[in-house]
Amino acid sequence: PSLYEAKYVIDVLDEQPDMNLLKALGKRTAITTAGMDVAITSKADQQYDCVSRYFAPVAGIEEDPVTGSIHTAIAPLWAEKLAKNNIIAYQASSRGGVLYCNVLNQERIEVSGYGKLYMQAEIFP
């Protein structure tokens, strides 16, 4: 993914990416999604260390509500900038959420948080 660091939280909150352009720049195949998934992040104030949003329209996800995997890239960035290993991140989508990230080293990041049941289904054989 492309990771963009914004200067201000308001830049993250106000971001309105051109989904059609991101789709056109990316390419989806039966096996992989290549191309334009984008995360935007900035330093947060007080309650959180950083705030982020994540867009992946090529994969059929215009904006993902809370994305643990993208925070394996975001957390080390802020761990280094803030000189701390435990990062509290807020993903500011309409269903947003808090992620607790522990940067053990550049290869290992633990991400945790609280979940809510969004959907339930049964699949029959």
Task: For the regions a language model picked out, list residue spans one by one.
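Active-site proximal loop and beta-alpha junction motif in alpha/beta enzyme cores
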Residues: 1-125
